[in-house]
């Protein structure tokens, strides 16, 4: 399942990106994978992330990981501003390699 997350960043994109690179294995351990992460060219404090999760249980496990949430907050993620959208089952990533 694909999930879009939008969240404000207090410290800009660079600290969040570094945090993600160092902790990607934790997302993967929850059955998640990053598809896309980025900010608009005119505002590096508005993050959009697209992730793939194996199941709803995987997504719930990711969301309830308090240690990872603390790490994200330390990198500037303002988790209270987060908006999560579960994408339609017909959504897709790529049709050709």
Please report, for each region that a protein language model flagged, where it lies by residue.
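Short, well-ordered beta-strand segments in beta-rich or mixed alpha/beta enzyme
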Residues: 2-8, 36-65
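Short, surface-exposed ligand-recognition loops at beta-strand->loop->(often short) alpha-helix junctions
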Residues: 8-18
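Residues that cap or initiate secondary-structure elements
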Residues: 11-13, 55-57, 90
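An amphipathic, aromatic/His-enriched active-site/gating alpha helix that lines ligand/cofactor pockets
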Residues: 21-34, 54-86
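Residue-level detector of flexible, active-site-proximal loop/helix-junction positions
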Residues: 41, 75, 91
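Short alpha-helical linear motifs
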Residues: 42-44, 85-88
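Short, low-order "capping/linker" segments at domain edges
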Residues: 87-97
């Amino acid at each position: 399942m694909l999930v879009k997350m939008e969240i404000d960043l207090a410290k800009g994109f660079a600290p969040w990106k570094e945090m993600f690179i160092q902790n990607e294995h934790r997302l993967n351990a929850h059955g998640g994978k990053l598809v896309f992460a980025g900010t608009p060219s005119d505002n590096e404090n508005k993050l959009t992330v697209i992730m793939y999760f194996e199941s709803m249980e995987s997504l719930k496990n990711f969301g309830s990981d308090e240690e990872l949430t603390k790490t994200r907050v330390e990198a500037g993620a303002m988790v209270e501003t987060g908006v999560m959208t579960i994408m339609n089952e017909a959504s897709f990533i790529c049709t050709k390699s």
